[in-house]
């Protein structure tokens, strides 16, 4: 199990086990092979990109799907951040959430050590749950 797996496994534990989990990823085949993503609880966004023309990625489909979810576990990516931000599960002012179990779990720190000089205090909204993500895994671009 790698560090990245630990982040997602711990984040999953913050959601009720009787709730479905929609897995959205640009490496969906890898996700389907993970032991910790097995069972009827997990639904995979498996739109075949080949159906949409040249086989190129069509992330807007995954973004739309994420906005329909009632919470989420996000990666340190702008796509997953916007997918969580645009959900209607919680109000944007940080008051009580509309859905009983609505929450977003976000990795903290967002970037690896290379980017420590940047002020990231406003990146993750106060109503989201920050979960430690070992920065040694986060690869610099």
Language-model-detected regions and their locations in the chain:
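A short helix-to-beta-strand connector/capping loop
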Residues: 38-41, 100, 124-128
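Residues at the C-termini of beta-strands that transition into short coil/loop
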Residues: 46-48, 108, 132-135
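Leloir-type glycosyltransferase catalytic cores
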Residues: 113-141
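Core catalytic architecture of nucleotide-activated donor-dependent transferases building glycoconjugates
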Residues: 1-53, 57
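Repeat-unit-sized solenoid/scaffold elements
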Residues: 48-68, 122-126
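Short loop/helix-cap segments at secondary-structure boundaries that form the rim of catalytic
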Residues: 31-38, 86, 113-118
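A donor-sugar binding/catalytic signature common to diverse glycosyltransferases
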Residues: 59-116
């Amino acid at each position: 199990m790698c560090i990245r797996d630990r982040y997602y496994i711990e984040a999953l534990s913050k959601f009720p086990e009787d709730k479905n989990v929609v897995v959205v990823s640009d490496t969906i085949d890898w996700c389907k092979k993970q032991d910790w993503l097995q069972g009827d609880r997990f639904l995979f966004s498996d739109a075949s990109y080949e159906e949409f023309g040249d086989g190129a990625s069509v992330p807007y489909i995954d973004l739309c799907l994420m906005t329909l979810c009632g919470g989420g576990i996000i990666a340190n990516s702008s796509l997953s951040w916007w997918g969580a931000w645009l959900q209607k599960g919680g109000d944007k002012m940080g008051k009580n959430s509309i859905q009983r179990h609505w929450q977003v779990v976000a990795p903290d720190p967002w970037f690896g050590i290379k980017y420590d000089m940047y002020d990231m205090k406003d990146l993750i909204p106060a109503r989201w749950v920050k979960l430690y993500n070992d920065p040694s895994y986060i690869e610099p671009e």
